[in-house]
Amino acid sequence: APHLVKPVPFLYPLEHRLWERAYVGAGIALYDTLASLAPGRRAMPLHRHLSRRRMSTKFPDLAHDAAIGAVQYWDASVDDARLVSTLVRTAVSYGAHAASRTQVVALTKGATGAVNGAVLTDLESGEEITVRARHVINATGVWTEDTEALAGDTGGLRVLASKGVHIVVPRERIKGTVGLILQTEKSVLFVIPWSRYWVVGTTDTPWTQDPTHPVATAQDIDYILDHANAVLAHPLSRDDIIGTYAGLRPLLQPGTKEGTSSAKVSREHTVASPVPGLTVIAGGKLTTYRVMAKDAVDFAIGQRATALPSITHQIPLLGAVGLQATRRLARTWAAKYGWKPQMVDHLLHRYGSSLRQLVDLCEQDPSLARPLEHAPAYLRAEIHFGVSHEGALHLEDLLLHRTRLVYEVLDRGLAALPEIADIAAPLLGWDDAAKQAEIDAYTARAQAEDAAEHEPDDATAEAVRLRATDVAAMQPLRG
């Protein structure tokens, strides 16, 4: 997915002249070597050692006494929501069936005791559907233990939910053209250039609350600010933050669920079959999703995997094929609709060659080619596309996962909400009352998340967040 993934240079600041430069350089050289062994041409440049002067030209806002130099290496960034939605649409294009707002509430078994299907609840309508399957693969992340229990399993894989929090600050607030990676006493902290912003994080703390709504706390935000400010020439404050977001990592853990430091738990994935007919995969990370998928399916089909080898490495995601031709066509579209170069880059990065479909919408309704009045980084067509092509059912889907307005603007997208609702309403069949209910629901969520950020710990922050009810609440499991 070359349109979704961008190479990003990072600096690893050095505090010691000799041993640290040699130690870090050797580690990153190994990283480069392993990357070179991957199939295909090399995607990233090799690492470089930088003097203090050269380091300062790349990141002027690094405090003068914070480092004597740096090692520059390359990594990549991706919008996880865009990647996942594009992945789902790609799977559907190959014949898969995908259903959002649908929850597995029970697993079914045959006469032999093997799992042979699942009972699903449509969280929108409340309707139950039973799906039969030759084999069920459980890839439910931090819900792994809950869903394993549906099969009556008590000894399967165990995961620890680890919370990671990031803050978002305006790009002009920090002077730099590259990212930073900083070692902390618990893990690492990244300062990542991202479009018009800097994303700073992450934390790594065990999460023992309900996994549905992880939230940032005052303690999380203070931790990030303290560690970032230790190396920045112009310290950040809470007033600089325009957004935060929190997520949970499903970290594999031996034995039972109880644990202390999530930073010491493995990030690798494991595949197991706790009961016949059920394969469980847990652990891993976003960047290894294709390897995880291959391993899970190979495990599930057993000996047939030899005759049916995985071809995932040969399958590009939607938007990748024809990308270069679309870049050229985009010049014509930009001239026709008055799009600035930044908008064209934004659209190509998010949609790749699928941008043609957005242009088709604009040709049918030229008003869709205009930016949103209170969120001009996005076109009105992107809201339409999020509903018509990407399965958004609610305003929160559009502001959290089809756009990222929830943390890209200070008000979490509230000013743009009426216009977004007006675009979505006819596509989703909302009358005025339903549209207002959607606006009210998202407003309550945004306000609750804002308030939660001022709470000292996870328990109190979650309690504040839960003051806003879900538009489609999860159902109890039948384990």
Which residues does each predicted region cover?
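C-terminal accessory subdomains/tails of enzymes that are appended
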Residues: L4-P7, E15-L34, A38-D65, V71-R82, ...
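Short beta-strand segments that buttress and anchor functional surface loops
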Residues: Q72-Y73, A118-L123
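Glycine-rich beta-alpha-beta "Rossmann" dinucleotide-binding loop(s) and their flanking helix/strand
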Residues: A91, D146-V165
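Residue-level detector of anion-binding/catalytic polar loops
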Residues: H97
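A conserved short coil-to-beta-strand element within the FAD-binding core of flavoproteins
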Residues: S100-N116
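A structural signal for short hydrophobic beta-strand segments in well-ordered beta-sheet cores
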Residues: V104-L107, F190-V191, V271
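Short, hydrophobic/aromatic-rich segments at coil-to-beta transitions
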Residues: A114-V119, K175-T177
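Core beta-strand elements of the Rossmann-like FAD/NAD(P) dinucleotide-binding domain
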Residues: E124-H135
